[in-house]
Amino acid sequence: MSLNFLDFEQPIAELEAKIDSLNALSRQDEKLDINIDEEVQRLREKSVELTRKIFADLGAWQIAQLARHPRRPYTLDYIQHIFTDFDELAGDRAYADDKAIVGGMARLDGRPVMVIGHQKGRETKEKIRRNFGMPAPEGYRKALRLMEMAERFNLPIVTFIDTPGAYPGVGAEERGQSEAIARNLREMSGLKVPVICTVIGEGGSGGALAIGVGDKVNMLQYSTYSVISPEGCASILWKSADKAPLAAEAMGITAPRLQELKLIDSVIPEPLGGAHRDPQAVAASLKTQLLADLEDLDTLEKEELLDRRYQRLMNYGYC
């Protein structure tokens, strides 16, 4: 079983390696006199117990590592598990189609919605094609085009946030990166349809916020949301990225802390060990939250929806 264990999970990795070795040995020689099944079961129970112990006391830096886990489910994974009849739409109708943003119409429990999200890649070629989940201006303009389409057809909007940040390249800046982000912030605040945003991995600065202005903002348990990466903060304050763990703790980037500050509404629990351990389970929990949020927002008239969203934005910074 290959789970790409992180540094703080190495004791778990050692147990899982022993389990794999015993299973391999059992397959090679079925006439062994020892009862391998009992030993494997004992080790599995020990692994679960150890995982619970480690994950009960995670620090902010460890959670940041989990948010970046290479096997963590991405937007298209959640679309596959939660929605039906997904029809992807491409292009910003001005420059190009940015593969770091995916979006289109789909059905959530039979209800038409517009779903938009950042998309990273897993293999090298896919990572490059998706630009490591860092959108250029055309990505945010594509997202806005789909949001405006959703408003015209009175479709709720669901966004999934998972980016280290907007792409900072020269070309992106020349094409108006800051303007594209600012325009999205302005336009999203005035959309006359329900908007539900969920941070599923990294919520990096303006690159995340550009599809993160909504009536409901949720976070998965082991996701992060911040104005800068811990490494970036450490490089500025302490002149060394090695201080990233200290920066992560000081910045308050985790879901429980942000909920305390009333910057997000809900924390969606993940399976033991993180979302990558059981993508279907976390997708089921996320779907339940999305349906509950939609049910709540459906009771509001358009003016009430806009007023509540405005008040939400104006209350940022007040605990």
Curated annotation (Swiss-Prot):
Source species, domain of life: Bacteria
Pathway: Lipid metabolism; malonyl-CoA biosynthesis; malonyl-CoA from acetyl-CoA: step 1/1
Signal peptide: none
Cellular location(s): Cytoplasm
Entry's Gene Ontology molecular function annotations: acetyl-CoA carboxylase activity; ATP binding; carboxyl- or carbamoyltransferase activity
Swiss-Prot/TrEMBL catalytic activity: N(6)-carboxybiotinyl-L-lysyl-[protein] + acetyl-CoA = N(6)-biotinyl-L-lysyl-[protein] + malonyl-CoA
Listed Gene3D superfamilies: 2-enoyl-CoA Hydratase, Chain A, domain 1
GO CC terms: acetyl-CoA carboxylase complex
The enzyme's E.C. designation: 2.1.3.15
Listed GO biological process terms: fatty acid biosynthetic process; malonyl-CoA biosynthetic process
CoA carboxyltransferase C-terminal domain span: 35-296
Keywords: ATP-binding, Cytoplasm, Fatty acid biosynthesis, Fatty acid metabolism, Lipid biosynthesis, Lipid metabolism, Nucleotide-binding, Transferase
Family: Belongs to the AccA family.
Quaternary structure annotation from Swiss-Prot or TrEMBL: Acetyl-CoA carboxylase is a heterohexamer composed of biotin carboxyl carrier protein (AccB), biotin carboxylase (AccC) and two subunits each of ACCase subunit alpha (AccA) and ACCase subunit beta (AccD).
Role played: Component of the acetyl coenzyme A carboxylase (ACC) complex. First, biotin carboxylase catalyzes the carboxylation of biotin on its carrier protein (BCCP) and then the CO(2) group is transferred by the carboxyltransferase to acetyl-CoA to form malonyl-CoA.
PANTHER family: ACETYL-COENZYME A CARBOXYLASE CARBOXYL TRANSFERASE SUBUNIT ALPHA, ACETYL-COENZYME A CARBOXYLASE CARBOXYL TRANSFERASE SUBUNIT ALPHA, CHLOROPLASTIC
Name of the featured protein: Acetyl-coenzyme A carboxylase carboxyl transferase subunit alpha
